[in-house]
């Protein structure tokens, strides 16, 4: 089952994306979610199929959500996923002796 999907990014939260069927635009997205998401900014369109891999989402979950509720919300990664951890000597550089 192939789906043509429009992907929107949130102006409120970095790396938050909303996947919707291109034919539905944003009609099936609940108003409460739209308020929390902010005014959607179109990022790109994509053809989704079970064979296609997505970098941070399970394609089968995305397709199921598109079919059942009309949208899929991709949340930003957990903080630990994108924070660079500094070496111990840099962390202690300004510590008092």
Swiss-Prot record:
SUPFAM superfamilies cross-referenced by the UniProt entry: YcgL-like
Q: What is this protein called?
A: YcgL domain-containing protein Psyr_1564
Organism of origin is Pseudomonas syringae pv. syringae (strain B728a)
Give every YcgL domain span. 3-87
Which Gene3D superfamilies does the entry link to? YcgL domain
């Amino acid at each position: 089952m192939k789906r043509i999907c429009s992907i929107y990014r949130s102006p409120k939260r970095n790396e938050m994306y909303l996947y919707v069927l291109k034919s539905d635009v944003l009609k099936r997205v609940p108003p409460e979610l739209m308020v929390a998401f902010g005014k959607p900014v179109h990022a790109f369109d994509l053809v989704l199929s079970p064979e296609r891999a997505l970098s941070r989402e399970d394609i089968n979950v995305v397709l199921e959500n598109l079919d059942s509720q009309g949208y899929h919300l991709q949340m930003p990664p957990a903080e630990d996923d994108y924070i660079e951890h500094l070496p111990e000597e840099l962390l202690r550089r300004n510590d008092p002796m």
